[in-house]
Amino acid sequence: MIYGVGIDIINIKRVEHILSKNKQSFVKRVLSEHEQALFANKGDSAAYCAKRFAAKEAFAKALGTGIGKIISFQDLTVRNNENGKPNFFLSEKLRLYLVNKNIKQAHLSLSDEKFNTVAFVILETED
């Protein structure tokens, strides 16, 4: 059964602008340690950050909490499997919160084109 659906879209140029002004603070606030390590080697760093930002915002919308009180950007890490499919890896705090809500699965789809990145998340319960 679907618990929630979230979608987020962000303009990559907006992220480029933010990175040009406040790269360190933005990267530290939005990206997990794992993502920060990969970010250092990315050629298109704005697109990489935009995808992670949009994915985390969409997750928070699907959960119905937004980013802030219940979860932070640091509670979510987006990693791609060997085929390139993006998946969420959760902090222990967030994992326990989802268990309490009976949420068993998070589905993530990311897409981008020249100017925008979009993320779509579905959270499922077992019921």
Curated annotation (Swiss-Prot):
Localization per record: Cytoplasm
Q: According to the UniProt entry, what is the EC number of this protein?
A: 2.7.8.7
Q: Which GO terms describe its molecular function?
A: holo-[acyl-carrier-protein] synthase activity; magnesium ion binding
Task: Quote the record's binding site residues for Mg(2+).
Answer: D8, E57
Protein's UniProt name: Holo-[acyl-carrier-protein] synthase
**Pfam family name, one:** ACPS
Write out the catalysed reaction: apo-[ACP] + CoA = holo-[ACP] + adenosine 3',5'-bisphosphate + H(+)
UniProt keywords (A-Z) are: Cytoplasm, Fatty acid biosynthesis, Fatty acid metabolism, Lipid biosynthesis, Lipid metabolism, Magnesium, Metal-binding, Transferase
- Biological process (GO) annotations? fatty acid biosynthetic process
Family membership: Belongs to the P-Pant transferase superfamily. AcpS family.
